[in-house]
């Protein structure tokens, strides 16, 4: 079975554990997801079954939109509602100050990834080192914040909706916001609403071609040449400029790259749903 769809991951379970459930549900051995959701987080998880797992590098997943809630006065080593270390009282915030801080934290934002994350450190995952109590530092990175708005504030809980680039950590954004407001805080809830055009629709199977924005090309000879993976020449394509292209056939599609007047297959014979 080949399929591409959006699942709704519940809070309290890892993305890998949730994927195992889906594999049993659909009776498949090969499956994958794009964009890990932390165990405490819920929402949109792009899932592919079978050979469609090869598509993750080519589908459009930006911007990513989240709904997040901060717990003011709480601190956590993992920057979420797990591993809570301390809870202190803090005075209510001025709404104007909160909105001003959010307004300043737009555009390209520098941040430090959470130590409880899947980042690699000397060949190991950062969360493995953090759980083992080892000392290490992660390098500053940048995220693109396209938009962010306050959605609710009932002290000590402050909620916002944020649109960010792929690979961003909303937990780290919340730490930047807390620092700007002069308080300690951690995320108590996080929901991913969408990734690009991907939204949850009861696991409806999707047409991958609707989510790949590569320019289209045409093979001007016998489609069987592509089906058999034969070597292609630029002269046999409608467009010969360098770049990545999608070639669509009746039963399948392929992704090719033209570089230095040479055509190479990036993906071939991807069956349609």
Feature annotation, model-predicted:
Residues 47:
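Phosphate-centric recognition/catalysis
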Residues 50-53, 74-75:
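Short, charged/polar surface micro-motifs in flexible loops or helix N-caps
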Residues 58-113:
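Acidic, low-complexity central loop/insert segments
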Residues 107-129:
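Long, charge-dense, solvent-exposed interaction surfaces that engage phosphate-rich ligands
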Residues 125, 130, 156-197:
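Pseudouridine synthase
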Residues 130-139:
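Short aromatic-glycine motifs in intrinsically disordered, low-complexity regions
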Residues 142-158:
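Helix-hairpin-helix/helix-loop-helix acidic hairpins
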């Amino acid at each position: 079975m080949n399929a591409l769809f959006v699942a709704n991951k519940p809070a309290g379970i890892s993305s890998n554990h949730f994927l195992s459930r889906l594999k049993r549900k659909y009776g498949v051995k090969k499956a994958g997801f794009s964009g890990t959701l932390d165990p405490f987080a819920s929402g949109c998880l792009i899932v592919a079954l079978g050979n469609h797992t090869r598509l993750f590098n080519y589908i459009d997943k930006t911007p990513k939109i989240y709904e997040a809630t901060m717990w003011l006065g709480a601190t956590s080593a993992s920057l979420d509602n797990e591993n809570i270390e301390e809870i202190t009282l803090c005075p209510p915030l001025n709404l104007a100050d909160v909105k001003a801080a959010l307004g300043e934290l737009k555009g390209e934002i520098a941040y430090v990834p959470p130590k409880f994350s899947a980042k690699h450190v000397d060949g190991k995952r950062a969360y493995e080192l953090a759980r083992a109590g080892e000392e290490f530092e992660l390098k500053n990175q940048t995220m693109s914040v396209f938009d962010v708005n306050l959605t609710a504030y009932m002290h000590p809980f402050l909620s916002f909706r944020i649109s960010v680039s792929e690979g961003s950590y909303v937990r780290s954004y919340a730490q930047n916001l807390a620092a700007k407001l002069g308080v300690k805080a951690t995320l108590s809830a996080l929901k991913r609403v969408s990734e690009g055009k991907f939204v949850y629709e009861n696991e409806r199977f999707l047409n991958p071609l609707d989510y790949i924005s590569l320019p289209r090309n045409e093979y001007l000879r016998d489609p069987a040449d592509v089906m058999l993976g034969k070597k292609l020449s630029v002269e046999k394509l409608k467009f010969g400029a360098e770049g990545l292209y999608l070639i669509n056939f009746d039963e399948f599609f392929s992704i090719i790259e033209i570089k230095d007047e040479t055509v190479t297959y990036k993906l071939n014979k991807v069956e349609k749903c």
